[in-house]
UniProtKB/Swiss-Prot annotation:
This is LexA repressor. Its EC number is 3.4.21.88. Gene3D superfamilies: Umud Fragment, subunit A (2.10.109.10), Winged helix-like DNA-binding domain superfamily/Winged helix DNA-binding domain (1.10.10.10). The active site is at residues 119, 156. It comes from Pectobacterium carotovorum subsp. carotovorum (Erwinia carotovora subsp. carotovora).
Amino acid sequence: MKVLTARQQQVYDLIRDHIAQTGMPPTRAEIAQQLGFRSPNAAEEHLKALARKGVIEIVSGASRGIRLLMEEETGIPLVGRVAAGEPLLAQEHIECRYQVDPAMFKPSADFLLRVSGMSMKNIGIMDGDLLAVHKTEDVRNGQIVVARIDDEVTVKRLKKQGNTVHLLAENEEFAPIVVDLRQQSFSIEGLAVGVIRNSDWS
């Protein structure tokens, strides 16, 4: 399983878009110019990294010798820090993409969140793990959800009663978060559908 850095994803996207628009891949010089690299050699280093990860093939002896080996859609985006008031899946929040089949999860995963803290440790969700999330607002009491409260994003077990929502931790050291829907902004960003251990990617 492969992960692209944000810069590698930029290079990959540029190659894909250039092929879509012109029918041929860009030269190293064109990549360097488009992305602000100092020289074509810098572009070459990124191409070699993409080739090592198996997402492109470099054809030797040709200035445009680049062939794509994967489609972007196979990558699940990892969402980083989210600024207040902005959509969770805004492009600027996507740190990288993990080459994992979304259909591994039921329902399928739309994005990944890096878990921060140990509030859900009792059900095996640990600090640094990647939480696979299905984007939906259709959730039921008792499910593990990704919720946004006044622009803070958290992962907890849902319990809703009337105008009050209790977000329950799976760690006795953490008190429930109580949300008054009449006074606080609250939304469901998605349903947790699986966990990828942090050590799986080391």
